[in-house]
Amino acid sequence: MMHFKSGLELTELQNMTVPEDDNVSNDSNDFTEVENGQINSKFISDRESRRSLTNSHLEKRKCDEYIPGTTSLGMSVFNLSNAIMGSGILGLAFALANTGILLFLILLTSVTLLSIYSINLLLICSKETGCMVYEKLGEQVFGTTGKLVIFGATSLQNTGAMLSYLFIVKNELPSAIKSLMGEEETFSAWYVDGRVLVVMVTFGIILPLCLLKNLGYLGYTSGFSLSCMVFFLIVVIYKKFQIPCMNGEQNSTVSANVTDACTPKYVTFNSKTVYALPTIAFAFVCHPSVLPIYSELKDRSQKKMQMVSNISFFAMFVMYFLTAIFGYLTFYEKVQSDLLHKYQSTGDILILTVRLAVIVAVILTVPVLFFTVRSSLFELAKKTKFHLCRHVLVTIILLVIINLLVIFIPSMKDIFGVVGVTSANMLIFILPSSLYLKITNQDGDKNTQRIWAALFLALGVLFSLISIPLVIYDWACSSSNGEGH
């Protein structure tokens, strides 16, 4: 993660612009926190230790080497909220329906608090090393392996977000077109086939945007994306009081079960319960954007950035819970992994408007995430100098692969499940705790904190060991039963 999980602050836009030279210095991304004229770091690289450690020296640096933050606390909260908000919000009602209200609330609260703790670990690591970029931090602590692991986790997370956004186009655009044509949902034709439409949108709109050399104003669409999701939440709450339970589906055969079907469940276990935790984790990933936002924060300090994360996560917690609970109380066990798809827009201008707004938002957000993934690949291959043929070829190949995955993936819960138990788990649990334990392994004063970090790491490993086999088992059962999972 709608990411809209992209956290589009200035630092990211600079990083996503393709550099002109092969040997590009990344020192502009290495900020150093200074307290009383000295760097507070016990894990500083040899290269940096040879530099003068005084404020006067820092003031003499070039602007691209040390840039004081200029973003206010309020705008930083907005930026981090943008980074947190993603397509995961559409799957939370489905997660609630398969866990029950009480269990879902426990899971949502737990992931929120654990995510805040992981950001605290990340900020401590940044302060100790002087690194303000996640990949640089991994490289300094674990060498090339650390850099590759973080690049891989971040790229997988962004790819998962792109898949979920294009899946929304595949699901929602046919309904929107049918509504605009005045046709019923049962209407079928090649031009309202989601698979055809997602390919047309990808190569007609997204491909030209992805071929641009830099993002330009496209990078500022995250504000629009967040606004769309706030609008979606308002509509979900409003529609709860308009749509009757079972949505007119009850008849003489099922009337006896209507009361039970329209009664909220507080604790539920079934084969789909396994997707709840990965979906929630997917919805809260913002860690690649935390350090860039930190670097832009005015008068930055660890305490101030922690306040930014606390406010942002609390706001998203409220928004996520309201969306999940009202979506669930509208459709109960009939809710789908894409909540928006359950609403019928035929003859309903409000639903049609929110559907079109979300479609436009995700279409504009995909290129932003694509720039990040492609830039990461070029940097790993040390091919940072712009080359038109390579630029076009890599773009087309990646978009073809992504489209094939979108066409053949049965439902959004599969995206949430896979990305949630892999990259989201790595970015929230495993990487921050591993970095912290490595950095503080010589610090005897932090034994208590190290124990908590070790438990946090163990929790992430346990999450993977339990969730991955269960997701695979559900796929196997669904396939053997001839069901789409």
UniProtKB/Swiss-Prot annotation:
InterPro entries: AA_transpt_TM. Keywords: Amino-acid transport, Cell membrane, Disulfide bond, Glycoprotein, Ion transport, Membrane, Phosphoprotein, Sodium, Sodium transport, Symport, Transmembrane, Transmembrane helix, Transport. Residues 1-74, 134-148, 212-216, 295-310, 370-391, 436-450 are cytoplasmic. Symporter that cotransports short-chain neutral amino acids and sodium ions from the extraccellular to the intracellular side of the cell membrane. The transport is elctrogenic, pH dependent and driven by the Na(+) electrochemical gradient. Participates in the astroglia-derived glutamine transport into GABAergic interneurons for neurotransmitter GABA de novo synthesis. May also contributes to amino acid transport in placental trophoblast. Regulates synaptic plasticity. Inhibited by alpha-(methylamino)isobutyric acid (MeAIB). Inhibited by lithium, potassium, choline ions, N-methylglucamine. The pH dependence has an allosteric effect on the transport. Belongs to the amino acid/polyamine transporter 2 family. This is Sodium-coupled neutral amino acid symporter 1. The modification Phosphoserine is found at residues 6, 25, 28, 49, 52, 56. It is a multi-pass membrane protein. Specifically expressed in brain with the highest levels in cerebellum and thalamus (at protein level). Expressed in glutamatergic, GABAergic and a subset of dopaminergic neurons of the substantia nigra and cholinergic motoneurons (at protein level). Also expressed by ependymal cells lining the ventricle (at protein level). Expression is also detected in spinal cord, heart, colon and placenta. N-glycosylation plays an important role in the L-glutamine transport. Its main location: membrane. It comes from the Eukaryota. GO terms for cellular component: axon; basolateral plasma membrane; external side of apical plasma membrane; membrane; neuronal cell body; plasma membrane. It comes from Rattus norvegicus. It catalyses: L-glutamine(in) + Na(+)(in) = L-glutamine(out) + Na(+)(out); L-alanine(in) + Na(+)(in) = L-alanine(out) + Na(+)(out); L-asparagine(in) + Na(+)(in) = L-asparagine(out) + Na(+)(out); L-histidine(in) + Na(+)(in) = L-histidine(out) + Na(+)(out). One of its GO terms (biological process) is glutamine transport. The keyword GTP-binding does not apply. The gene is Slc38a1.
